[in-house]
C-alpha cells in the first residue's frame, strides 16, 4: 500500500536553489523503509531456504553414513564368506586326497586279499585229507657224503641209512630186506673164498684174526676151507639181525678176506 501510495503520482520536485519540501522527505523515507522491509523479507526467505538446505544436507550425510555402515557390514560378510569358501575348498581338497589314499588302500587290500585267497587255496590243496603230502617231503634232505666218508662207512651202514630215510616203509619190510642183503653178502663171501687159491690160514679167533706165515704151503688150503665155512656162516646173519648199522661186522669180514689172500 505504501508503494502504491508512493507511486500514485509524480512527486513535485523542489526548485534547485529553494528549500526542500517536507512531503518529499516523507516520501523518500517511506520508500527507504519499504525497501528495507522487502530486503528483510528476502533475507528471511533466504535463511529459511538455507535451513532447508542444511536439513537436506544433514539427511544426505546420515544416509551416506548408513550406506557406509551397510557397506562395512557387507564387506565383513563378504570377507567371512570368502574365508568360509577357502576353508570349504581346503576341506574338499583334503577329502579328495583322503579318497585317493583310501582308493589306494582298497587296491592294496584287494591285492592282499587275492594273495591270501590264493594261499588259502594252496593250503587246502596241501592239507587235503584225500591227497595229503607225506611227511618225508617236508624233511630236510641229508648232506651228500664225500668219497672218503663213503669209503669209511661200511656197506651195511649205507643200507641202514637208506632204510631209515624211507619212513613210509614198514619195519618188517626193512628187516626182511636187511636179512636178504646179509645173506647175499655171505654167499658172495663164500664164493670169493672158494674161488681164491692160496696158503691155508688157521681158524680165526674172535679177538684178532691171525696173519698167514710165509712158510705155509698151498696144499693145505683145501683142508682149511671146510673149517672157514662153518665159522663164517652163522656170524653175518647174527650181526645183521641184531644191529644192521654196526660197522664191526663189515670190518671183520674185510679182515677175513685179507687174511685169506
Swiss-Prot record:
Region described as Leucine-zipper: spans on this chain: 20-78
Chain residue numbers at which the record places covalent cross-link Glycyl lysine isopeptide (Lys-Gly) (interchain with G-Cter in SUMO2): 128
Ubl conjugation listed as a keyword: yes
Tissue/organ expression: Skeletal muscle, liver, stomach, lung, kidney and heart (at protein level). Strongly expressed in mammary and epithelial cells.
Superkingdom as given in the UniProt entry: Eukaryota
PTM: In vitro, phosphorylated by PRKCD.
GO MF term set: protein kinase C binding
Modified residues (Phosphoserine): 62, 70, 165-166, 173
Region described as Interaction with CAVIN1: 1-84
GO biological process, one term: negative regulation of phosphatidylinositol 3-kinase/protein kinase B signal transduction
Region span, Interaction with CAV1: 135-203
Protein's cellular compartments: Cytoplasm; Membrane, Caveola; Cytoplasm, Cytosol
Biased composition annotated in UniProt, kind: Pro residues: 200-212
Job description of the protein: Regulates the traffic and/or budding of caveolae. Plays a role in caveola formation in a tissue-specific manner. Required for the formation of caveolae in smooth muscle but not in the lung and heart endothelial cells. Regulates the equilibrium between cell surface-associated and cell surface-dissociated caveolae by promoting the rapid release of caveolae from the cell surface. Plays a role in the regulation of the circadian clock. Modulates the period length and phase of circadian gene expression and also regulates expression and interaction of the core clock components PER1/2 and CRY1/2.
Family the entry assigns: Belongs to the CAVIN family.
Protein name: Caveolae-associated protein 3
Highest classification ranks of the organism: Eukaryota, Metazoa, Chordata, Craniata, Vertebrata
